[in-house]
UniProtKB/Swiss-Prot annotation:
Gene3D superfamilies: NADH-ubiquinone/plastoquinone oxidoreductase chain 6, subunit NuoJ (1.20.120.1200)
Membrane topology field: Multi-pass membrane protein
Pfam families: Oxidored_q3 (PF00499)
Protein species of origin: Rhinolophus monoceros (Formosan lesser horseshoe bat)
Ranges that cross the membrane: 1-21, 25-45, 47-67, 88-108, 149-169
Protein name (record): NADH-ubiquinone oxidoreductase chain 6
Entry similarity comment: Belongs to the complex I subunit 6 family.
Length: 175
């Protein structure tokens, strides 16, 4: 049952990102990001990261709802364009979905999928030891992996947030 839930959440996650990338109107782009953020937090929570999922939900969606509310108020159209009103936008949406399906099929058919990093053993993770037994903490492991193996991800995320703030400031100033 858990596999089906994660599969459905992942499908909604991909469709919302394809919908965001082929947005015909800023309102639908914001809705796509909000849906993908909420579903992404649900995926994280389904894998046992309840604290991380809740924090991302509160911080990401709380902050982004303010930004989307402000930018939507600035860019409101009386009759917003939808996906089916323009053949080019609908074609981009469908082609994005086809590319995602082909990618998933290629990944499922490949015998070996190599990751971006390798783990050298249990010594790379934080272990709580009590006498003869040790316990992993999932959230401590995630934070340790993020700042050791995923340092490039932190840098790209920080840079993307900075560029996003600059773009929002330029758009609202009319530059």
């Amino acid at each position: 049952m858990m596999t089906y839930i994660v599969f459905i959440l992942s499908t909604i996650f991909v469709i919302s990102f394809v919908g965001f990338s082929s947005k015909p109107s800023p309102i639908y782009g914001g809705v796509g990001l909000i849906v993908s953020g909420g579903v992404g937090c649900g995926i994280v929570m389904s894998f046992g990261g309840s604290f991380l999922g809740l924090m991302v939900f509160l911080i990401y969606l709380g902050g982004m709802l303010v930004v989307f509310g402000y930018t939507t108020a600035m860019a409101t159209e009386q009759y917003p364009e939808v996906w089916v009103s323009n053949k080019v936008v609908m074609g981009a949406f469908i082609s994005g979905l086809i590319v995602e399906v082909v990618f998933v099929l290629c990944v499922l058919n490949s015998e070996e999928l190599k990751g971006l990093f390798e783990l050298n053993g249990m010594g790379d993770w934080v272990i709580y030891s009590v006498e003869d037994s040790g316990v992993f903490s999932k959230e401590v492991m995630g934070v340790a992996a993020l700042y050791s193996y995923g340092v490039w991800l932190v840098i790209v995320t920080g840079w993307s947030l900075l560029i996003g703030v600059i773009v929002v400031l330029e758009v609202t100033r009319g530059g």
